Amino acid sequence: MTDPQQPNNIKDDLTEAFRLLKQTVKATGVNLIDNYSYREYTATEVLREHLPSIKKSIGRTGDDASAEQENYFKIEQKSGTNENKTLTMSCFPKMMFDKQSDPARRNYIYEYDGFSLSFFEYYVPYPTAVVFVPKEHVAKLHPLFETKQQEKVKDFEKRLNEGKNIGHDAITVSLEEMIEHIGAENMICWLHGNKINSQDFFQQVSNKTIKINQ
C-alpha cells in the first residue's frame, strides 16, 4: 500500500538535503550539482496541477516530459537560475534549440506540443516561478521559429562559403518573445507553487515586486 505521506516526506527530505548541500558549497566553494536534473523533476511536479498525467522522461536525450491523458506527447522544459534579488524577465532561461544545421532537427521543433520555463532561486529545490505554454497556443510560436531558422541557415551558408566553421548552431527564444507572440493571457503561471493569473504574474515581474535570493 502506498504511504499517503510519502510525497510530503520526499519534499521535506529534499529541502533538508539542499540546506545541507548549501552549507557544503559555502565551505568548499565548489558547485556539487552536475546535471541539475532535480529542476525538471520538481518543475514537473508543479505542472501536475494542470497536467495530472505528466511524466518526466528518463535520460539526457529525447523529449523532457509527456502527459498522454491530456494529449501532450512532447513537452520541452527549460530551467535556470540567477543571482538577482528581484525576479525579472531576464531571470528566466531562453528556450534553446540546438543542432539547427540538421534539417531533421529544424523540423523537430514544430512537433512540440508544450513548453515550460522555470526559474529557481539558488539552492532551493522547487521552482520559484513556472511559465507554461499550452498546446492550444504553441503554433503561434511557429512563425518566430521559422524566422530564426531562416536567419541561422543564411548564416550557415555565408560561413561555409567563406570556408569557416558554421559555429554555434542553436536558436533561442526568450520569454519576452514568447509573450509577444502568444499573449500573456494565454500562458499558465505558477508562483511559489501556486497557480496565479498570468497577466497579474507578468505585471508583478514588470513592476519588480517579487523578491528572490533573500
Q: Predicted regions span which residues?
A:
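Nucleic-acid endonuclease domains
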Residues: M1-Q214
